[in-house]
């Protein structure tokens, strides 16, 4: 997910993407804890996606 793509979305869509990403992170953490997760890189990718979404939301709040 690229920041440029996120900047084109409205606030409602960003909130939806954020909720989906947080749910996915929650599920990945459980899989990791029970040794069912094969691709551990996905954990960092989802965390970075969440950070990108929050950054874009903050930019919109500040009117940048």
From Swiss-Prot:
GO cellular component terms, semicolon-separated: cytosolic large ribosomal subunit
CDD domains listed in its UniProt record: Ribosomal_L29_HIP (cd00427)
Entry superkingdom: Bacteria
Keywords, comma-separated and alphabetical: Ribonucleoprotein, Ribosomal protein
UniProt-recorded Gene Ontology molecular function terms: structural constituent of ribosome
HAMAP family documented for this protein: Ribosomal_uL29
NCBIfam families according to UniProt: L29 (TIGR00012)
Family: Belongs to the universal ribosomal protein uL29 family.
Protein name: Large ribosomal subunit protein uL29
């Amino acid at each position: 997910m690229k920041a440029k793509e996120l900047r084109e979305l409205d606030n409602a869509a960003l909130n939806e993407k954020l909720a989906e990403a947080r749910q996915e992170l929650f599920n990945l953490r459980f899989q990791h804890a029970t040794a069912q997760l094969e691709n551990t890189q996905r954990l960092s990718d989802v965390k970075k996606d969440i950070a990108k979404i929050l950054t874009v939301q903050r930019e919109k709040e500040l009117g940048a």
